[in-house]
A protein has these predicted regions:
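Terminal amphipathic alpha-helical/low-complexity segments used for targeting or macromolecular assembly
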Residues: 1-59, 177-192
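Short secondary-structure boundary/capping segments
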Residues: 6-7, 52, 98, 122, ...
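Short arginine-rich
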Residues: 37, 164-169
Length: 192
């Protein structure tokens, strides 16, 4: 049996972004988000967000202007806080661990566009998943690119662009992000 475009997309394979099923879902999500982001009652707003996502744990809270493409590829653990203007482009799975906190304007981007102009012009897209461990804190305006895994207990400095994967217990900053400190499991900087 042939895979659907949604199945190919979620698996990180080449797919047609203008597939009818995908267009219908994106349109539905945009309409829902436009309405939900206007809700001032925090509990109601966050309950509505949760209903559109694949999985959320307990104590899920996102401020308004939360944006994503599909929702069915977003998996978030317990105790998540997202500040204003969080964007998750979820063509592939985005998995976020427990006790994670995102500053304003954090962007997680799984889509990958072909370098070959002919393939781009044919509306072919791909993607790569993003995985974020437990107890990760991201400062404002952090950007995480496709295929990145961020370990447990990582701090990502404001404005960083994360282009590659990082291990547990580090502080990363910059564009592209680089390690500036290693941490012990209590969060203390390890002196060299």
């Amino acid at each position: 049996m042939m895979k659907t475009e949604r199945e190919k997309m979620t698996a990180g394979e080449s797919y047609q972004e203008f597939d009818t099923e995908l267009i219908t879902r994106r349109k539905f999500i945009r309409q829902q988000l436009q309405e939900i982001n206007q809700i001032t009652d925090n509990d109601n707003r966050n309950h509505r967000f949760q209903s559109l996502l694949a999985k959320t744990g307990t104590n899920f809270f996102v401020e308004s202007e939360f944006k994503f493409d599909y929702g069915f590829n977003i998996h978030i653990g317990d105790h998540f806080y997202g500040n204003y203007d969080i964007t998750m482009l979820d063509t592939c799975p985005i998995t976020i661990g427990e006790h994670c906190y995102f500053g304003p304007n954090v962007g997680l981007y799984t889509p990958v566009h072909p370098l070959d102009a002919k393939r781009r012009n044919a509306d072919v897209e791909m993607g790569a998943p993003i995985t974020i461990g437990d107890s990760v804190w991201m400062g404002g305006r952090v950007t995480v690119l496709p295929g990145v895994t961020i370990g447990n207990r990582v701090v990502v400095g404001a404005g960083s662009v994360v282009t590659k994967s990082f291990p547990d217990d580090v502080v990363i900053v910059g564009n592209p992000a680089r390690i500036i400190h290693h941490l012990d499991q209590d969060g203390n900087v390890i002196k060299n």
